[in-house]
Amino acid sequence: MVKVSITKDLYKLAAAHKYASMLAEYLSNGTKYWCFGSHGGFERNYQAMAANIRKIHLKLPGERPWPPEFTSSQRTCDNFLVYAQHYYDDEHFQILAIISPDAHQLSDVMLPRIITLAETSFIELSPDELASLKTYDA
């Protein structure tokens, strides 16, 4: 069962909780949501790839959704939902950042901090520490 938690920095952001619930469904069974677009990693950054950090293009509330005929790879924008997959529990993910606007430009600058956040507060947590996190399951 896929579980998605939220980093402490975003915990008070209501939208992050909604995205966590939707991300769990998306990763678990491929449920499509109006706000989720193209999905991938930060392939040009070895440290981000090594830390299991990924991104999904994200439409924000109030933005017009992509046309329904667009494929996932056509659903691109300049906002990212950034998350990591745990090293040992491959069904547990954590939302680390929402980068908006100018995600393509800012992500290179923000990645070192996001990598450190993933490494120090999520990707190597023990099973007991993971169990203590509030999660959205699917």
Model-derived features: positions:
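Basic, Lys/Arg-enriched alpha-helical interface segments
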Residues: 1-78, 87-138
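Hydrophobic/aromatic beta-strand elements that line small-molecule binding cavities or substrate pockets
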Residues: 81-82
